[in-house]
Curated annotation (Swiss-Prot):
Its main location: nucleus. Residues 229-249 are annotated as: Basic motif. It comes from Oryza sativa subsp. japonica (Rice). It comes from the Eukaryota. This is Transcription factor LG2. Residues 115-125 have a biased composition (Polar residues). Transcriptional regulator involved in defense response. Acts as a transcriptional activator in vitro. GO terms for biological process: defense response; DNA-templated transcription; positive regulation of DNA-templated transcription. GO terms for cellular component: nucleus. Residues 292-506 form the DOG1 domain.
Amino acid sequence: MVQGEESSWRMAASTHHERAIPLNQALAYGVQAHASPSVAAAPPASFLDFQPAAAAAAYFGELEEALIHGANAGGVVDPGMIRADVHSKSAAAAATAGYLAARPPTLEIFPSWPMRQQQQLHSGNSQSVGSTTDSSSAQNTMPQMELVSPASIRASSEHQHQQQQPGQEVMMVTTDDYSYKPGLAAASPSFQQQHQLQHHQQQQLHGGGDHDKRKHGSTRKDGKSVDAKTERRLAQNREAARKSRLRKKAYVQNLETSRVRLQQIEQELQRARSQGLFLGGCRAAGDMSSGAAMFDMEYARWLDDDSKRLTDLRGGLQAHLLDTNLGLIVEECMQHYDELFQLKAALARSDVFHLLTGTWATPAERCFLWMGGFRPSDLLKILIQQLDPLTEQQMLGIYSLQQSSEQAEEALAQGLQQLHQSLADTVAAGTLNDGPGVPNYMSLMAIALDKLASLESFYQQADNLRQQTLHQLRRILTTRQAARCFLSIGEYYRRLRALSNLWSSRPRENFIGTESVSPTGTELQPMHNQPQQNQYSGF
């Protein structure tokens, strides 16, 4: 009796400390059963389902006495309230006893094993067995009774012991002797805590978590599940599609860059034609080789760059830059001319006649060409007048360079003249009246082709002489003199190109070749006496 009162009092104190639970909820959910004092139990359930009616009635009687004694000790309880409470509790105990008496007895198969209550989780392929509904709530399901072995109890006790809170005592019920003894264990969680725990366990059981998604796949929007292998394939397809889009974007950008470059080349070619670069050629435009066409476009680009460098040189001289800064511009001009010599050397290996005939130059420039370029000695004569004042040592160096250039030019001219004579003799060998039917016609053409191949060697030697002359002149002059030298060369050829443009666009009424009758000497005399500026008054 004393043990029951002590247990009832401790249970009431713990219940008041945690949460005030009404008596009907205590009957619905019961108290928490334990297999041993050190083992934490599952969510609480009604232990009256498996207790005799007499034991239940005795328990409620002891509970009433404990409440009455506790209230008398405090001296704050109204006797009328005690009688009403006792009457209501007696009625509840009688109703519970009648409900238990009406149920059939439960067969105990293993009476020596302890029994604990465990909440059964609902899965897709499992069926709920032995569940009953509570009269207070139709949505709550009573937990099922499950027989467990001592080994399973010991295994689950370690996990449940981590959830215990020290300092709290609950009632422990065993099925062996129906004795009630206090023990230290975790307090009974509330209904909300049980619902949260059940929801968390269901999420873990039914595919919750990233690990299960990676292992078992995921669910699409249409509700169909996708396994992990399909997920990997879909991810690989998305990555391949992304890389394909990047390659396509780069390809489109390449095409756009090429289109812009082609438009620029066409504009440069049109500008070169407007400046008279292709006037009076020895061949039609359709007969021009691909290498020659490429050289013409590159030469037009070179002229544009040359005009920019001439502007920089003129600005540097007018601003009186330091020799260091001005020397950088001079070196760029020297490298720019070296680039032109490289372009000509590449074209000489494929089409040397395009260079020798001067088709790439304007008509006025073509008049002063010597073996496909400028004559070094003539250029030195022009520059000496533009480089004053010169020191005596510089004058000696320039005159020495001029003499060596003239000697090299004479040697190349003699060699080229001999080649022309030899080539003419080869072509004129045999009888010219017989035509292609001559027996040795093909052999003569083969010999002539070998001699024509020597033209490339002569042109390369002439270009090397021009390039070496510029480099030697750069070493003789100072930085400012070299800047004036390159500025004078560029301005000289710019004036020749301008002269060609003026000649190609001269007024047509000044042409004499259209006259049907040639004028006599007396008629030509007044024409020579006319002032020359009247012929180009429009310019």
